[in-house]
Amino acid sequence: MRNMIQYRCFFLDSTGAIRSDEMIECWEDQDAVETARDMLEHRSHYHGIELWRGARRVHMEVRLPDVPAFTIRAAHGL
């Protein structure tokens, strides 16, 4: 039986600075990425995550700020 792998999930502010971290255990990298994304979803005051397995960065993800929709219109006669 194999052991679960330990990961550290860092939570980033709007400038990309680390503001918090949490250890998680998962069977493989993809499970850890999904877990970290779920954690970020429930922590709306953070803007991104970095997921590390020891000295190897597994994943980095940053939320884009909400931008109002806009329309680009072509000028007539071009």
Label each PLM-derived region with a short phrase.
Residues R19, E34, H59-E61:
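Short acidic, gly/pro-rich beta-turn/loop elements at beta-sheet edges
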